[in-house]
Amino acid sequence: LVATYHAAAVPLAQRPVGQVTAAILRQPGPSLESPLGNLIADAQLHATRLPGQGGAQISFMNPRGVRADLVPDEQGLVRYGQLFAVQPFGNHLVVKTFTGAQLRAALEQQFDSGTNTPERPRVLSVSAGFGYSYDLSRPAGARISHMVLHGQPLTDEARVRVAMSNYLAGGGDNFTVFAQVPDMLGGGQDLDALEAYFRASSPVAPPATNRITRITRSAPATGSNQ
């Protein structure tokens, strides 16, 4: 029976879904965002950006939800089984409305909530168009600064629509602020969103890891948010 199901799954796993220009990895960069995490955030935003899909303006992806690198074959092809290896949990996307202050509080939890600490931070990847800076030398609750959306400052009073997985929306990975907002619009499965993004955008290049800036004494700069 197991062999029968395995044989039936092989054609699905081998189905091409798109192309990449280079391997897209989950290894974090200096700011602790990752190219593959950023790609998934972009795919989630693409799937939820229209008004009927939730009207999302920003998307977040938790690093623990990215389970494998995306390495193409010699022709640059990526297959469905590889996408499944990257996102195997079957989460679905949701969109919630947050104030800028709530987003700031949620981002502070990357460094100060449960097992998320300055020594072992859990930095979310973000979709293109959104960016911010953080400084781990500052005290808890004051580490996030310079939040911007499409080049404009994101104030504490602003209201924005944010896409994420139902796991993250429920407070997963110690992001309890996300669970404090009850309104929610349910969407499709995360894996379907990633496949649709590849079909719409191939060939896909590895996203730059310049959406978030980690401020240090030697490099107190803000991100380019591209």
Please give the residue ranges for each predicted region:
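Feature captures C-terminal
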Residues: 38-226
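Active-site-adjacent helix-turn-beta-strand microarchitecture at beta-sheet edges
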Residues: 1-12, 115-119, 137
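Glycine-rich phosphate/diphosphate-binding loops and the adjacent beta-loop-alpha structural elements
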Residues: 12-33
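Short N-terminal helix-initiation segments at or just after the protein's N-terminus
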Residues: 4, 31-37
